[in-house]
Amino acid sequence: FAQTQRSKLQHRRARINQQINKEMRMRAGAENLFRATTNHKVRETVALELSYVNSNLQLLKEELEELNSSVEIYQNESDAINVPMIPLGLKETKELDLTDALKDFIVHHYGDDGTLYDKEIREFMDLRQAMRTPSRSDAGIELLMEYYNQLYFLDNRFFPPNKPLGVFFHWYDSLTGVPSCQRALAFEKGSVLFNMGALYTQIGARQDRLSVEGVDTAIDAFQKAAGCFSYLKENFSNAPSLDMSTASLSMLVRLMVAQVQECIFEKFVLQNPRSDFFTQLQAAQEAARVQEVYTLVYRTMTQPPVKDYIPFSWSTMVHVKAEHFRALSHYYAACALCDYSTASEAEVKTQEKAFSQFHVTAPEGPSVGFVLQDPEERRKLGKAHLKKAIMKHEEAMRIHVLSKILRKMDILQEVLTLTHKQSLSKYSDIDHEEDFFETGEAPDIQLHFFFFLKGPLSVFSAKHKWRPPQKVHLEKGDDGFGFTLRGDAPVLVAGIVPGGCAAEAGVMENSYIVSVSGADCRWAKHAQVVQQLKDAGEDGVDIEVV
C-alpha cells in the first residue's frame, strides 16, 4: 500500500511538472510577443493572457509544494510514534531516444554499421526507462548505480569533448518542477546522483526507528544521502536547476547530517533503557547536540536563496524539531537531578566532576558540589530545567500550528503532545504546595563532544601557538596575589602589579589561568576562579597559566 501511495505521489509530481513546463512555454511565447508588438490592443490581450498563465503557474507550484511536504507517505507503516523525517522526491525526466544519435556516431566516428548495435542500444534505453521509477530499496539504488556507471562508458565512447552529440537531457527540478535541459552528459550524471541521494532519504525515512537495527539502517541511509549531495556540491558546477545549486546542496547536506544526529540520539535512548545519573546527563547532551544541528539547518533554510525555494513546511518542521530537542535536553537534565541521589563520597565526586562540565554557564546559587549533595537543591535545579522544558515544548507546538500542512500531520502532533505531557507530569511530581521560592532560570546544556576538557575552541585551537602550562605557587600579600583578572572561560590575567607576588613568580600579562589548586578551570567563570583564589589558605595556592 505504501509503495502504491508513493507511486501515486510520484505520478502526480510528473503530471504537475509537465503542466508547469507547458505553462512556462506559453509564458515565454507571450512575453516574446509582448516585446515584439507595438499594437496597443494586442499588448493588452497578451498582458491579460500573461496574468492567467502566471496565476496557473502559481497554483501549480503551490500544489507541487504540498506534494513535497507529504512526508508521512514515506514514513514507516507501523504504529510506532516517531518524529517524522524529511525525505526528498525524485527528479523527473522526459523519455529520451538515443538510438539515431548513437547509430550516426558509430557510422561517422568509428566507420562501423550502427545496426549491429541495436540490441545494446535498446538495452541501454530500457535501463534508462527503468531508472526513472526505482523501487524504494537496495534494488532501486543498484538500478540507479548501474545506469550511472553505464553513463561513464557512454561518455567515453560517444561524447567527444569538443562536439556535442546533438541530444538534450531534460530534467525537472525536484521541488519547483521547473524544467531544465542541457546537452552535457554531466547534467544527466548529476541528476541521477541526485536521485540516488533522494532515494536514500526515502529509505531512511521508512525505517522502524524503535529498533536498533532500524535506527542503524536509517543512519546509514541518511549518511549516504549526505555523501551523494556533498559529492554533487564539490564536483558539479553551473547547475541549471536550483535543486542542484551549491546553496541548496549545502542545505541538504546539513539536513541529512541533522537527521543522522537525531537517529544517534534515538539509538542512545534505545540502548539505555535502565538509566542512571550519568546516562541521563549524556542523553541531555545528545538531545542538545540534535537541537544545535537543527538550529543550524533552520538558519540555512531561512537565508536567501534557499528561503524562497524550499517548502515552508520544511523550515517549519526543522524549527519545531530544534525546539523539541531543546525541551528534551532540559527534561533529561531534570531526570538526572531528581531521580537519582548520591550514595557515597566517591559517587559525589564523580557526579560533581561530570556536572561541573554539564552547563554552558554555572547555575546561579550554591556550588555544584552542594547542589548535588542537598536533595532540596537538586529538586530546585531540576524544577528549573523542567520549567524550561515545558516552555520549549509549548514553543514547538506553537510553531507547529503555523504551518497548514504540518497541522495535518497527526504523527508529529502526537509526538509533541506526548513529550509535553511527559514534562508536565514530571513537574507535578516534584512540585510541592509549600514551594514559595521563585524558580530560577536553568542554564543551557553544554554539548557533548570529544576533547571537551581542552577548553573553549575559540581559544584552545590549532591556529594558536601554545607552550606547556607554567606551574607557579602564589602567596597572598598586602596587594593580594599581585594581578587583575578579566573574562570567562578561560579567565585572563589582565594586569600584573610590579613587584607583586605574581610578577616575582613569573606570571605574564595576557596569560590564561587553566588550573587552580589542581582543579581544571579552562571553562570556569570569572567569579568561580576569584572564589577559588580567595579560598586559598596561608600556604598560598598553586596555579597553572598558559
Please provide the spans of the model-predicted regions.
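Membrane translocator/pore-forming domains, dominated by Gram-negative outer-membrane beta-barrels
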Residues: S241-A284, V293-P304, D308-Y309, Y332
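Flexible helix-coil transition and linker loops at the boundaries of alpha-helical arrays
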Residues: P179-L185, S230-S248, T302, Y309-I310
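PDZ/PDZ-like domain segments forming the peptide/carboxylate-binding groove
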Residues: K476-G480, T484-V514, A519-W523
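Eukaryotic intrinsically disordered, low-complexity segments enriched for acidic and Ser/Thr/Pro residues
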Residues: F1-R15, G29-A186, L210, Q271-Q282, ...
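Non-transmembrane amphipathic alpha-helical segments
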Residues: I16, E23-L33, V53, L60, ...
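"A position-specific structural signal for the A-helix of alpha-solenoid helical repeats
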Residues: E188, N195, Q202, L249, ...
